[in-house]
Each structure stands twice: as C-alpha cells, then as structure tokens.
Amino acid sequence: MNQTKFTFLVPSYKASFLEEALGSIKNQTFLDFKVIVSDDCSPEDLKPIYDKVCGGDSRFAYRRNDENMGGKSLVSHWNLLVDMCDTEYLIMASDDDVYEPIFLEEMDKLVQKYPKVDLLRAKAVRLENGKVVLKDGDIPEYQSQDEFMQYFGVKKMVLCLANYVFKTEVLKEKGYFPDFPTAAFSDSATAIHMSRNGIATTKDILFTFRISNENLSCAKNYSKNAEKGVWANLMFLDWYGQHFHQHYPYDDFAFGIEQYHLPRLPFCKMFKYYCEFRKRGYMKQIRPNLTILKNWFKLRLL
C-alpha cells in the first residue's frame, strides 16, 4: 500500500467545468494526496486544461483510454481506476463537481476519529444549471448502517458519489462498484454496502454537486435513457435483496418510480415494467390506479 493516504480518481469526458473541478482538488489544504485524471477518449481536448491547472504538480497524473468506456458502462471506467489505486483511501471524483479547500483536511480528521469506518462523507449542496436546489440537512457525525439507512434517500440528503471517501481495500473486497445501466444507483448501492462499519459525515457542507444539461442525471438526458434508468431500479432492488435478504424498506423509493421513472417510458414499456415490479414483489404499494397514467400524460403535455 502506498504511503500517500488519499487518491482522487477523476474519470473525465466533459471540458466545460474540468478546470474548476481540478482546481478545487489542487487547492486542498491537506497535501497528502495524489490524483489520477483519466480521459475517457473524449472528443474534446482535455489535456491542455490538465496541463494548465496541474501539469507541473507531481501529485497529478494524466492518462487516456484508447476507446471510450463510459458510453457502454460508466462503472467499468470507475472500476478500472479503483484497480489502479494503491492508497488507503480513494475519492471517485468527477469532471464538473467542486470541493471546498478544507474537504480533505476535514475528512482526515474523521479518519483519525473513526478509524474503523470504511466510508466517510462530506455534506453537499446540489446545483442545477447554476441554482441551488437542495442542501444536506442535519446529519449526525457518526451513524451506524441502520441509522444511515434511515436517512438515505429519505431525509434531506444530496445523493451523489464524489463526496464519499472509500477505504480502498474494503471496496475491492466487496466487489468494486456494481455495474447498473447509466451507473444509476451504483453509487447508492456502494454507499449502503460500505457502511457496514458505520459512516462518518462532516458537519459543514464541503462539496458542490453540479447538474447541468451535460449530465446523464439531468431530466432532459435522463428521459433519453429512461428505460435504462428503470432497469437500473430493478437491478438495484435485486442487488439489495441479495445482500440484505429483504426488500428495500422505504416507500419513498416506490414514490420515485411511480412519479418519475415509469411515466417517462412509452406506454407499452411502462406497463411492461410496472408488471415486472409487481411480479418480483417490489413495492406492493405501487398503486394500480391513475397515478402513473396521470404522470405519463402530464409529461407529454408539457
């Protein structure tokens, strides 16, 4: 294991915010880290941005995939980088999100305070096209896995990937990131899995999660990948059942499927997947009434 403590892994494809993202990593007040910037065969020229921001910093390294991986599987690129990581902890960063300068400094304090936890998290704010739409609420500094699950996807919490710090060897032992379509729920599944020994969270917001028209997560691009998103829902629920031997416990998940995911599909596919959710025994509370139909028509009349 490398003596350096942390590695930022930065799978990169978009140029728009890369300079700001890399600058926020370079400007960390805690200096014991290194960075692998991995160009996913982008059609945009990312290397000059890398050279401008951090080309002279020996902690940073740049590589480029011979072929694009993210178009087929974002998670395969993540896991390739996890394989390259040789430090005790890793952060799966991105090409457009921003860290506060004391992000790593505060994370290291939590590492020292809670050495047995395998997962740490910075509180976050979510931006959509430049506007704040969600901030983390009150979250305890330490939570057991059960306590974390009471918050996850239910309480006021920004769900994303790049604000987590993972213990590298444990992530590898648990099988890396699960590969769901468009990487939907891959981060959530990993966070849940890695929280077995608890999770430590910063008291302040130290991370900005950016959603723009270039993200798969934005509504416009999600609609293009709606069927993959619904399939990822099913894969996540299957994964949860395999690891925890019970159905995913929260009604909020069913609400999201009913209100957001299924109505984005063409009608016949919507009905097909609705039946699949019911057949597998997931979310019996998905109601056989007009709610999904109402949302289906509403989306098409906008």
Report each predicted region and the residues it spans.
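Membrane-interface aromatic/basic loop that binds lipid-linked glycans or pyrophosphate carriers
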Residues: 1, 260-302
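Conserved nucleotide-sugar donor-binding catalytic segment
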Residues: 11, 143-223
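Short, well-formed alpha-helical segments that are part of the catalytic scaffolds
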Residues: 14-27
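Acidic donor-binding segment of Leloir-type glycosyltransferases
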Residues: 26-66
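Glycine-rich, basic loop-to-helix element that forms the pyrophosphate-binding segment
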Residues: 66-85
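Short aromatic/hydrophobic "clamp" motif used to bind/position activated sugar donors
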Residues: 90
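Conserved donor NDP-sugar-binding/catalytic core segment of glycosyltransferases
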Residues: 102-135
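Catalytic core of nucleotide-sugar-dependent glycosyltransferases
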Residues: 143-146, 152, 183, 205, ...
